[in-house]
């Protein structure tokens, strides 16, 4: 893709956004239902393309966490479909009166929510973001330009094609949703300069991506949290609740960027809490690493009974 191709793509998306902004709630929900139907119909093709991306990433020796974020399964497609259903069920964010007052000159002043226009989204490995973001943008009346990671390109192209075909079937402009298929990093930087056509940029990924967007983007940007993912267990903690929170924060999806990294336990609750926590984690895909303090208190040679647990062995961890 050349710079002019990118500009042409953003112009088309910008023009389409003017049509989408006038869609009624019923229009948007019907369109999302059609996208839901077509993704469900094409799940085999989605999985086929995803397998190509997975194999390419394995050939590049990507690690387990990376492959896990990249991988789509029947279950993950069900979650994608559930996500669209949940978005359909949301109240329309457009057209809400958030302030209404009469000024001194008797003029009625109203503050009403409207679409932003065109949203650019740069994300990394996870292809399910393609449907999440597209659905949220349609629901909020915004057109979107997607820039996914090169490793998930085949899956993203497949998903975007299904969405664009749904737009055509609905009888509207398929430029509501566009995907930048180039893997050239120069194109990414050019993308961040197009504030004439893009109203907001959202990076979804690691610290380096977020910092790069914050530094390079000429349009406003919204960045997600990339901060500390720690949990502290206080002596006053409800042990059962604390274990449940830790498991949900880590074991439910350990490969994502906001999964729990560090567990800090107060020494007063450590003798009671740690053995129960270890038992709960023993069947998860998490590898527990701990300071010698824990080892001295409990004489734990290894919380999983061997030098590496069965899940860690599958991941090639030592």
Range-by-range predicted roles:
Residues 1-108:
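N-terminal Rossmann-like NAD(P)+-binding subdomain of aldehyde/semialdehyde dehydrogenases
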Residues 5, 9, 16, 27, ...:
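General structural feature for long, well-ordered alpha-helical segments within catalytic domains
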Residues 12, 125, 132-143, 162-169, ...:
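ALDH superfamily catalytic-core signature
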Residues 50, 54, 181-183, 292:
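A general secondary-structure junction signal
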Residues 65, 69, 144-148, 262:
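Short amphipathic alpha-helical segments at helix-loop
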Residues 89, 98-240:
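Rossmann-like NAD(P) dinucleotide-binding subdomain of oxidoreductase/dehydrogenase enzymes
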Residues 317-318:
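Internal helical hairpin/lid segments
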